[in-house]
């Protein structure tokens, strides 16, 4: 089913808007502006995923920083495209990007507590919860998980 899945770094305005839409749909409590997305293109490795011409998901790979020596891998799949193998394929690509950044780094992810599909997916990939927190002004917790 994933044979026609296509991923790319968002470059055009439309691709940036597609990435933004996926993020803001999957993480509705933390909307990003297009300027936020442009910033992420510069700081992180991000991909937008299409099935044919239909946007179905996105990834973010955050490199290690002084504050966090882990590489953070985030996979987002729009609800109507879940349970079809796309998340697994996107995770495989994002994990490869993470290993390119820092082969021996700890791998972490973050999931919104109100996204049970995302939490279940992360746990099936071998991630275990390490922390729950709510950002100032937010009402839904984020869950940090580490690859065991």
What residues fall within each predicted segment?
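Short loop/turn motifs at secondary-structure junctions and domain boundaries
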Residues: 37-42
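A short, internal acetyl-CoA/4′-phosphopantetheine-binding micro-motif in the GNAT/acyltransferase core
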Residues: 74-83, 111-112
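Short acidic/glycine-enriched loop/turn segments that link adjacent beta-strands
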Residues: 43, 67-69, 115, 136-141
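Conserved beta-strand in the GNAT
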Residues: 48, 54-63, 70-72, 76
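Short amphipathic alpha-helix that is part of the acyltransferase structural core
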Residues: 1-34, 143
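C-terminal "cap" of GNAT-fold acetyltransferases
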Residues: 2-3, 132-148
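Conserved active-site alpha-helix within GNAT-family acetyltransferase domains
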Residues: 88-92, 102-103, 112-132, 138-139
């Amino acid at each position: 089913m994933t044979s026609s899945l296509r991923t790319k770094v968002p470059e055009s305005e439309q691709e940036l808007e597609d990435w933004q839409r996926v993020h803001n749909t999957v993480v509705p409590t933390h909307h990003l502006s297009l300027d936020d997305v442009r910033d992420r293109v510069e700081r992180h490795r991000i991909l937008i995923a299409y099935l044919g011409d239909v946007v179905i998901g996105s990834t973010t790979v955050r490199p290690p920083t002084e504050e966090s020596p882990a590489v953070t891998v985030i996979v987002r799949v729009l609800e109507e495209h879940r349970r079809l193998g796309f998340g697994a394929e996107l995770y495989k690509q994002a994990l490869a990007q993470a290993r390119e950044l820092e082969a021996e780094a700890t791998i972490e992810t973050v999931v919104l507590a109100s996204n049970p599909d995302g939490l279940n997916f992360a746990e099936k990939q071998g991630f275990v919860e390490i922390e729950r927190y709510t950002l100032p002004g937010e009402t839904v917790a984020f869950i940090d998980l580490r690859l065991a």
